[in-house]
């Protein structure tokens, strides 16, 4: 069987539900099986996975940094819905300046994107899996 291109849609926060951690475990399985993980789109509460100010206890799994590491090692694009992020207090430097906000807190490695990035991923991937 040839390698498939996967894209993920994550709608759950990094902590408090299983959605994001299940998505991360699925992403690891996809890569481990020899498939190509192309992009991950964080939407709704899923945008909280990109919050640079998340600080889990030292004995807890740091899912936010795990996403970063996965992206760096596998060249996965981490897209964050800009509208959902701004509603939840997550912004990059550009948006913070545009909106006259005090600071930016988008975790490095994540990119604020519109729904067009999700549409493109849906069209170009063999499998889109939502969590």
Swiss-Prot record:
It is an enzyme of class 2 (transferase). PANTHER family: PROTEIN YCHN, SULFURTRANSFERASE TUSD. Belongs to the DsrE/TusD family. One of its GO terms (cellular component) is cytosol. It holds the Pfam family DsrE. Keywords: Cytoplasm, Transferase, tRNA processing. It comes from the Bacteria. NCBIfam families: PRK00207.1, sulf_tusD_dsrE. The active site is at residue 81. Part of a sulfur-relay system required for 2-thiolation of 5-methylaminomethyl-2-thiouridine (mnm(5)s(2)U) at tRNA wobble positions. Accepts sulfur from TusA and transfers it in turn to TusE. It is found in: Cytoplasm. GO terms for molecular function: sulfur carrier activity; sulfurtransferase activity. The gene is tusD. Heterohexamer, formed by a dimer of trimers. The hexameric TusBCD complex contains 2 copies each of TusB, TusC and TusD. The TusBCD complex interacts with TusE. One of its GO terms (biological process) is tRNA wobble position uridine thiolation. Its EC number is 2.8.1.-. Gene3D superfamilies: DsrEFH-like (3.40.1260.10). This is Sulfurtransferase TusD.
